[in-house]
Amino acid sequence: MAGIFRQNTEITYDDKDLIEENTFIGAEPDMTPLPKYEDIKNDLPQPVWDNHKDYLDCYWKAWEIAFGNLGMPTKENGFVSSYIDAAFNGCIFMWDSAFMLMFGKYADRIFKFQSTFDNFYAHQHVDGFICRQIDEEDGKDIFARHDPASTGPEVMAWCEWDYFLNFGDKERLARVFPCLIAYHQWMQEHFTWRDGTYFSSGYGCGMDNCPRLDEKYHICYSHGHMIWVDACMQELNACNILIKMSEVLGRDEFVP
């Protein structure tokens, strides 16, 4: 049943000291009023492409939809920053947010799309776990931590690094780094097989229509006792990025 698992109510055996560095948990919410599309349209990047009106109309419609699906923190959901919603089922999603943030960066001076991730960090568990899907109404995790569909893919580090390369915000990088390390450590401990390879699920990897599983397994929820090559590559990419972050921040204590 959706929404029955609350952050940090379980007894865990692997609590991370890094969580003490997570400044998003319990932070004062940012209640800055949301921008309205009609007020900021002229401040958005203005494409010039002669004889391609349909493409330009699509471009502007994408921005209109984006700014029409922004949300704010509430007392009930425990969010700390305004965010872009996936416009799907009243939840924020780790995977969807990462890709929306990738185009949202072109409007960063208007709205901090990157702050969508703040709400995932604010709901990080004491052992490093972050649920990939969080209810916007009450802030509850939709999945329990050890459900194969509970989290992933590990793409937040990739997105945060891309923002750093674009904007050079070292203060932001330093703030999110312990959250990302703790999350990676959780994934390494709980979503791997004995040989160090990773598993996931259709929902967990973001490709819930990929026909890779034997028909006896659920395509969305099961790991099928398989090694998931995309999950392995996502983790490799995350590790490489976390190493780059550690070099920038001078925090090599996490590098083997």
Task: Give residue ranges: language-model regions.
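Alpha-helical scaffold segments that form or flank carboxylate-/histidine-based iron centers
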Residues: 86-87, 91, 96-100, 171-173, ...
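C-terminal capping/lid segments that line or modulate ligand- or cofactor-binding pockets
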Residues: 89-92, 146-152, 156-166
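Well-ordered alpha-helical scaffold segments within catalytic/enzyme domains
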Residues: 40-51, 98-110, 155-172, 233-251
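Low-complexity, Ser/Thr/Pro/Gly-enriched N-terminal "stalk/linker" regions
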Residues: 1-92, 115
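Alpha-helical support elements that line or immediately flank enzyme active sites
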Residues: 90-124
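Active-site acid/base region of carbohydrate-active enzymes
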Residues: 43-68, 107, 120, 125-129, ...
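The feature captures the catalytic groove of carbohydrate-active enzymes
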Residues: 3-28, 86, 127, 131-155, ...
